[in-house]
């Protein structure tokens, strides 16, 4: 029987769980990425030193290789290339235009507004428009505080909370400098708890997997410090969030594969979806926490979608799982990482840097530990 070939877009540490799972499933893995930082080049069957945004070049190689499926995890930038190749080769994947929409916060918000999906008030700013009357007048329509962020980046990179008019332009310039398209989003700041939602979809049917409670640093950078599953939200709120997410996925046209939605919920009960990525959540949410809390192998599910052999998810356990990240702000957890083997709940631990820094983005964190237990692991 012919061994199936799976193309993986990206080869950094983020894709390592995907490549290892594919190998475990007996698949032939082909990774595409720049060689610099390509950790998966050492473990995949074949590696191509091609930028993940070079979709035409990657398509040609995939056609020559006669791949059976293509996917990525935890990478927004790779998603349009995955869709482009899948569409061109008749493989399972999202429509290319849908993947582009999900990769641009402005296009995404426009789709949400059209479909009646609750989201923050927003405005786009570019180098050409930043000093125009339209933007100057538009800024007056927002109340302080507000948020600026790149339109096409994930995580906390380039995100700033603005508290006064003098901060407008430095924050917008920063966001544009971090954007691939040099575009900044200005949006209302919503005070409330942060959650994220994991779904997997197959041919237009959406399956909810889990909701994650999040802990972040305060303004201005909002770097994530903790994730915990399942969320402590009520069953009624779970159902409401799942319904909104399905509507949002349909609004974007995302029909296949993993998705990761981020929400804010105010004390008054207002729900606002901040964004959806056409990929699973990073920070171990998709690769580890979902499996540890539900028993469902999310990574294996993503591969099954790509190969067209997906089966409806089955949740086999009901545990608590989570991750704590090490940095200057969380230095109190350092003794736990140093002695993690004495904590039976901890299933994985790594210190990546001996220096603890105040974090401005996720890359500034110096380690982590992942737990699974019958209740939330609290410190």
Residue ranges of predicted features:
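Flexible, glycine/charged-enriched surface loops at secondary-structure junctions
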Residues: 256-262, 312-317
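ATP-binding N-terminal substructure of ATP-dependent carboxylate-amine bond-forming enzymes
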Residues: 1-98, 129, 311, 319, ...
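Active-site nucleotide/adenylate-binding loops and adjacent lid/helix of ATP-dependent enzymes
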Residues: 104-185, 191, 203, 227, ...
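Peripheral (often C-terminal) accessory segments that flank ATP-dependent C-N-forming ligase machineries
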Residues: 114, 136, 303-379
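ATP-dependent carboxylate/phosphate-activation module, predominantly the ATP-grasp catalytic core
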Residues: 166, 188-254, 258, 265, ...
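Conserved protein kinase catalytic/activation segment
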Residues: 269-271
């Amino acid at each position: 029987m012919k061994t199936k070939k799976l193309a993986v877009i990206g080869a950094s540490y983020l894709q390592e769980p995907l490549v290892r799972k594919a190998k475990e499933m007996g698949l032939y893995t082909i990774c595409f990425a720049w060689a610099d930082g390509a950790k998966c080049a050492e473990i995949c069957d074949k590696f191509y030193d091609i930028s993940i945004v070079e979709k035409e070049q990657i398509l040609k190689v995939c056609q020559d290789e006669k791949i059976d499926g293509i996917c990525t995890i935890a990478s927004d930038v790779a998603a349009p290339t995955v869709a482009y190749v899948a569409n061109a080769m008749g493989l399972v994947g999202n429509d290319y235009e849908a993947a582009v929409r999900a990769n641009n916060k402005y296009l995404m918000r426009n789709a949400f507004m059209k479909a009646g999906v609750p989201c923050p008030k927003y405005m786009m700013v570019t180098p050409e428009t930043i000093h125009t009357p339209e933007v100057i007048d538009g800024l007056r329509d927002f109340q302080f505080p507000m948020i600026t962020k790149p339109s096409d980046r994930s995580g906390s990179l380039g995100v700033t909370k603005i508290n006064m008019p003098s901060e407008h332009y430095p924050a917008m310039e920063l966001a544009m400098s971090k954007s691939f398209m040099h575009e900044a989003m200005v949006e209302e700041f919503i005070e409330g708890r942060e959650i994220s939602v994991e779904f997997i979809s197959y041919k237009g049917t959406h399956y909810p997997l889990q909701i994650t409670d999040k802990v972040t640093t305060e303004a201005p950078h909002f770097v994530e410090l903790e994730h915990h599953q399942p969320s402590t939200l009520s069953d009624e709120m779970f159902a409401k969030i799942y319904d909104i997410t399905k509507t949002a996925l349909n609004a974007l046209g995302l029909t296949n594969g993993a998705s990761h939605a981020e929400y804010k919920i105010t004390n008054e009960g207002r729900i606002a979806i901040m964004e959806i990525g056409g990929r699973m959540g990073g920070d171990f949410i998709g690769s580890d926490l979902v499996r540890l809390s539900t028993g469902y192998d999310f990574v294996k599910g993503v591969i099954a979608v790509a190969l067209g052999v997906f089966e409806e998810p089955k949740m086999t356990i009901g545990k608590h799982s989570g991750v704590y990240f090490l940095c200057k702000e969380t230095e109190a957890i350092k003794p736990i990482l140093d002695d993690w083997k004495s904590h039976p709940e901890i299933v994985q631990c790594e210190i990546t840097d001996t220096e603890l820094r105040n974090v401005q983005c996720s890359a500034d964190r110096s380690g982590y530990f992942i737990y699974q237990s019958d209740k939330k692991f609290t410190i």
